[in-house]
C-alpha cells in the first residue's frame, strides 16, 4: 500500500483534535494483525500503547498510519505502563547520563580483567547495595549513573548503537526548552547524522516515516514532535522486558560477582587468597 504524503496543514488539525478521534476509535487488542495489510515495506508486530515512549504518540501514529493501528490506553481496565527500555531511556535522557563513557569503560575493563576490588579505587565501581537496588525497578536502575551506562551498553548489544543513540537524541530534543534557533539546528543535525541518504550513522527507517519527518522540517522550524513517529518506530525494536533480561545478562552478572568477590576480600582483611 502506497501512502500519499499529506501536508502538515491537513495532519495537524487531526492531531489537535485527537481527543475526538480517540473517543471514536474502538480497537480490540486481539483483532489487529499488521501482516494482513498489503504494505510489506516493514514487518511490525501487533502494537499497543505500551510500545510507545509517550502515550500521545499513539494518536499521531494511528492518524498517520491507519493501516497499522495501535491500541490506546484504556484507563478503566488497564494499568498505566510502558516498555522497560523506554522507561529507563527516558529517565537516562532527562538525567543526561548518556555520555558517561568513562564510567562504563572502567566497569567493563575491570569486569573483563577480573581485577579485585582491593586494587581499585572506591569510585571505580558501584557499591554492592547500588547494584542490588537495580533489581527492584527500572527507575532505580536509571537513577544510577553506573546503571544507566551499563544498561545502554546492554541495549546497544541487543539492537544497535546507532538506534539507541538516535532514540536518546530524539528524546533530548523533544524534552528541550532551548530556543527555537538551537532546536532548528538540532533537527538538521539529527537528520544529517542518522536519517539522510549520506548519514554516517544511518539507521533503517521506513520511507513513509522519513517523508513525514521531512515535511515537518520543511513546514515548522524546530517542532518538538518532528521525530516522534520515527523515534517510536525505533523504540519498537527494543526488547520487551529488557529490565529482566539485563539482570540475566553476563554484563550485569559478572559485575555483581566481581563486587561480591571484592566485599568478601575486604571482610577478611584483604587476604592473599583473594
UniProtKB/Swiss-Prot annotation:
The keyword rRNA processing appears for this protein: no
Domain RGS, first and last residues per copy: 137-256
Pfam families: RGS (PF00615)
Keyword terms, alphabetized: Signal transduction inhibitor
Matches recorded under InterPro entries: RGS, RGS_sf, RGS_subdomain_2
Protein known as: Regulator of G-protein signaling rgs-11
The keyword Plastid is assigned to this record: no
Gene Ontology BP annotations: negative regulation of signal transduction
PROSITE patterns: RGS
Upper lineage: Eukaryota, Metazoa, Ecdysozoa, Nematoda, Chromadorea
